[in-house]
């Protein structure tokens, strides 16, 4: 419970017999794990050797409330050697860096009058109501996903904040359907 409050509130309280001290605890959590004990669940070419129920037991070692506080959850499949050895494809790192800098500048301007807020991840409900407005199509997509994956209110907030960030990276003043639909690959 203390960990979850630390992640949400970005501070931690340490209590001793006669006093309580608050410490700042803003951080970015980056974590990884295998999809199952053997590492081959959902692998495109290798078969998972885990006995029935092992994958579920393995996944349940991470609490649902903790997973619910991780903004981005991405399954990464192995890359075949031929793709690794070929010339790089996609957007160059320098171009991505420029998009990120522009998005951070957009957020800095957006929250210039909010001393405790520097980026979309730090938005409270009031700021989300102002800056994370969805059009009719985006709301329909979100409603369908929330129902299909039985997502929590915390997941709803997380999706809106990440969609706002994707829109910023796209230099879009509005959150559009394609900014939200990328977020439903993991419930």
Where are these regions (language model features)?
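Basic, amphipathic alpha-helical bundle interface domains used for macromolecular binding and assembly
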Residues: 8-186
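Positively charged, low-complexity/disordered segments
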Residues: 2-3, 187
């Amino acid at each position: 419970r203390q960990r979850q409050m630390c992640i949400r509130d970005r501070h931690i309280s340490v209590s001793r017999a006669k006093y309580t001290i608050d410490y700042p605890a803003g951080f970015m959590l980056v974590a990884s794990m295998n999809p199952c004990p053997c590492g081959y669940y959902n692998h495109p070419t290798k078969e998972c050797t885990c006995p029935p129920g092992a994958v579920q037991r393995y996944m349940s070692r991470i609490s649902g409330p903790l997973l619910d506080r991780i903004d981005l959850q991405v399954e990464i499949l192995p890359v075949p050697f031929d793709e690794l050895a070929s010339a790089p494809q996609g957007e160059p790192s320098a171009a991505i860096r420029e998009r990120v800098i522009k998005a951070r500048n957009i957020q800095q301007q957006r929250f210039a009058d909010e001393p405790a807020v520097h980026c979309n991840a730090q938005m409270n409900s009031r700021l989300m109501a102002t800056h994370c407005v969805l059009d009719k199509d985006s709301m329909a997509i979100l409603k369908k996903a929330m129902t299909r994956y039985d997502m929590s209110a915390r997941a709803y907030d997380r999706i809106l904040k990440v969609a706002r960030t994707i829109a910023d990276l796209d230099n879009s003043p509005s959150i559009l359907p394609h900014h939200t639909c990328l977020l439903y690959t993991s419930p």
